[in-house]
Curated annotation (Swiss-Prot):
This is Queuine tRNA-ribosyltransferase. Catalyzes the base-exchange of a guanine (G) residue with the queuine precursor 7-aminomethyl-7-deazaguanine (PreQ1) at position 34 (anticodon wobble position) in tRNAs with GU(N) anticodons (tRNA-Asp, -Asn, -His and -Tyr). Catalysis occurs through a double-displacement mechanism. The nucleophile active site attacks the C1' of nucleotide 34 to detach the guanine base from the RNA, forming a covalent enzyme-RNA intermediate. The proton acceptor active site deprotonates the incoming PreQ1, allowing a nucleophilic attack on the C1' of the ribose to form the product. Zn(2+) binds at C308, C310, C313, H339. Its EC number is 2.4.2.29. The gene is tgt. GO terms for biological process: queuosine biosynthetic process; tRNA wobble guanine modification; tRNA-guanine transglycosylation. It comes from Bacillus licheniformis (strain ATCC 14580 / DSM 13 / JCM 2505 / CCUG 7422 / NBRC 12200 / NCIMB 9375 / NCTC 10341 / NRRL NRS-1264 / Gibson 46).
Amino acid sequence: MSQQPIRYEFIKACKQTGARLGRVHTPHGSFETPVFMPVGTLATVKTMSPEELKEMGADIILSNTYHLWLRPGHDIVKEAGGLHQFMNWNRAILTDSGGFQVFSLSEFRKIEEEGVHFRNHLNGDKLFLSPEKAMEIQNALGSDIMMAFDECPPYPAEYDYMKKSVERTSRWAERCLKAHNRPDEQGLFGIVQGGEYENLRKQSAKDLISLDFPGYAIGGLSVGEPKDVMNRVLEFTTPLLPADKPRYLMGVGSPDSLIDGAIRGVDMFDCVLPTRIARNGTLMTSEGRLVVKNAKYERDFRPIDEQCDCYTCRNYSRAYIRHLIRCNETFGIRLTSYHNLYFLLKLMGQVRDAIREDRLGDFREEFFERYGFNKPNAKSF
């Protein structure tokens, strides 16, 4: 059997928490885990250049199958030599399957065994996405890590519906494996579903593990459920997954959830959060959230975060950034996006160091104390 394109190397476990330090090897380089992956929906992390992403330490980014299928079209990306070539990014890329967008963006959708009928959210055209189509698109994009096409039920969902959905997702996963035509160049991850139901998560994990994917994602979280529900589901789901393969929690990017996810054995995370909140002037800092549009920063000439050494904090003041964001200047959005991405990438570096030094539990306590996450009714992002 040929070498898998995706390989997980376990480095060590934190004695204090059990969190894992590891490294994932891909055809476009390796990255240490736990890792946060910036999201480049349309083959760009909004307002950031590939050079800036490398400068801040990003070794893997995510792109969206659904959006690239609609614009510019996977055939055009393939003609360009694949996504890496198209967007001038020579490090690892993960693509999602398009499933989440079909279920979250489209008003009209009809789920059948074959796949999903839905309307294009841009122009209302009728479209159809199936496991086979999702593989065809991702094979054309040429990402290092592809995701199986799954059903993303809403939260909360009735048990009976969720059971049928999990069974369908397992059948679709098998079809994805059969349709995947570049298994030596691209790794395909299965997605464990099951909502908050422990026995359904067990069933989903068992089905997918029998198919022997090179990695596994935990889907159906960060869809509106309370944080304690997410943590509880992770506590019984991550131990079900093979220890010698990467585990990816989809759609999670708030600092508290990244730390809590790592403590529960997760290796990979992605979310649009840092860039989305940056566009309206909400910033992550070592002392908690900072909304730079607030009037109190009008004459505040300090950097966004005095503990931060990013390009934004080394060069610009809160007052200047407030002015740019209030005037809708693109440069303001670039500065806030840079800072938030840098903050999360640096946070994950601190998490990895804490695992290395067996002190992630202490790190969490200090961080939550500083951020105010320990207070009753604490506000996350």
